[in-house]
């Protein structure tokens, strides 16, 4: 049959099986999985790393944002990398860690969710999506132990509970649901401080977008691996909301307006602070 029909798909593609695309690859061509690759001990190559991702809930959904910088050691490897993606219509994933592996993991995760929907005829629940991502991260543990870790932040709108939810992970695939807001990556310590101060119950989507952008401002202020908004190059964070209406990426024009408002406010605060300190310091000569 194969000789007569050389373009025909192998039988494996025509046989009903698991609703997991990752399981399908593991059974029929495991070399295509990121987890199948092994490095000699201690030989992790220099690789660009994604840095800071933040997420916060609002009334009716969740917002996820990421800066645009990737670093390799002390060097800026990329200024416009995108780290926030739609996992499917009602969920988003942001990546921190080894950029190349993280991007491949996201593409495989997107395909996993699409494959499930086609096989089962329905969307996977939000908890189910979070668990699938956990399993995929666990499969990368061998590379993570050699310094090539991937640590995503997953968020989405729960169609059953009618609210936004946030999930964080560790390098072993451990899954943890976060309340209200969270951040991962090198600037996460500073971003979390901003989120704690600025987030409050009852935010609408517009206010939540401002909160996560301010959190990225604070992270970039203290973490050299996090890139702040760049008005000169017109580089803005990637910010997306997920609600009952689905995944929606914020446009550059809207983000530029938010960044300008925050910058003006912080400029006024800085000038006021300098003025006060100047008058209190006096001339010590």
Swiss-Prot record:
InterPro entries: Ntn_hydrolases_N, Pept_T1A_subB, Proteasome_sua/b, Proteasome_suB-type, PSB_actinobac. The formation of the proteasomal ATPase ARC-20S proteasome complex, likely via the docking of the C-termini of ARC into the intersubunit pockets in the alpha-rings, may trigger opening of the gate for substrate entry. Interconversion between the open-gate and close-gate conformations leads to a dynamic regulation of the 20S proteasome proteolysis activity. Its EC number is 3.4.25.1. GO terms for biological process: modification-dependent protein catabolic process; proteasomal protein catabolic process. It is found in: Cytoplasm. Its main location: cytoplasm. SUPFAM superfamilies: N-terminal nucleophile aminohydrolases (Ntn hydrolases) (SSF56235). GO terms for molecular function: threonine-type endopeptidase activity. Pathway: Protein degradation; proteasomal Pup-dependent pathway. Residues 1-50 form a propeptide. Keywords: Autocatalytic cleavage, Cytoplasm, Hydrolase, Protease, Proteasome, Threonine protease, Zymogen. It catalyses: Cleavage of peptide bonds with very broad specificity. The active site is at residue 51. GO terms for cellular component: cytoplasm; proteasome core complex, beta-subunit complex. Pfam families: Proteasome (PF00227). The 20S proteasome core is composed of 14 alpha and 14 beta subunits that assemble into four stacked heptameric rings, resulting in a barrel-shaped structure. The two inner rings, each composed of seven catalytic beta subunits, are sandwiched by two outer rings, each composed of seven alpha subunits. The catalytic chamber with the active sites is on the inside of the barrel. Has a gated structure, the ends of the cylinder being occluded by the N-termini of the alpha-subunits. Is capped by the proteasome-associated ATPase, ARC. Belongs to the peptidase T1B family. HAMAP family: Proteasome_B_B. PANTHER family: ATP-DEPENDENT PROTEASE SUBUNIT HSLV, METALLOPROTEASE TLDD. This is Proteasome subunit beta. It comes from Sanguibacter keddieii (strain ATCC 51767 / DSM 10542 / NCFB 3025 / ST-74). The gene is prcB.
């Amino acid at each position: 049959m194969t000789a007569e029909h050389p373009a025909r798909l192998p039988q494996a593609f025509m046989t009903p099986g698991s609703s997991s695309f990752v399981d399908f690859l593991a059974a029929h061509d495991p070399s295509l999985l990121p987890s199948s690759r092994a490095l000699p001990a201690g030989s992790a190559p220099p690789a660009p790393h994604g840095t800071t991702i933040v997420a916060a809930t609002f009334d009716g959904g969740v917002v996820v944002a990421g800066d645009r910088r990737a670093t390799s050691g002390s060097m800026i490897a990329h200024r416009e990398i995108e780290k926030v993606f739609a996992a499917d219509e009602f969920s988003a994933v942001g990546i921190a860690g080894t950029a190349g592996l993280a991007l491949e993991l996201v593409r495989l995760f997107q395909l996993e969710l699409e494959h499930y929907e086609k096989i089962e005829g329905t969307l996977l629940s939000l908890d189910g999506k979070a668990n699938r991502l956990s399993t995929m991260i666990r499969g990368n543990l061998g590379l993570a132990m050699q310094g090539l870790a991937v640590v995503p932040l997953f968020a989405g709108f729960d169609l059953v509970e009618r609210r936004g939810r946030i999930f964080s992970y560790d390098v072993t695939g451990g899954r943890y649901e976060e309340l209200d807001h969270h951040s991962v990556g090198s600037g996460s310590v500073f971003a979390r401080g901003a989120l704690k101060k600025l987030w409050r119950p009852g935010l609408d989507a517009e206010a939540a977008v401002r909160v996560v952008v301010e959190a990225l401002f604070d992270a970039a202020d203290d973490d050299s691996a996090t890139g702040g908004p760049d008005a000169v190059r017109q580089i803005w964070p990637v910010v997306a909301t997920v609600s009952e209406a689905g995944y929606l990426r914020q446009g550059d024009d809207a983000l530029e307006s938010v960044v300008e408002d925050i910058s003006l406010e912080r400029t006024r605060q800085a000038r006021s602070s300098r003025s006060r300190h100047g008058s209190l310091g006096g001339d010590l000569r």
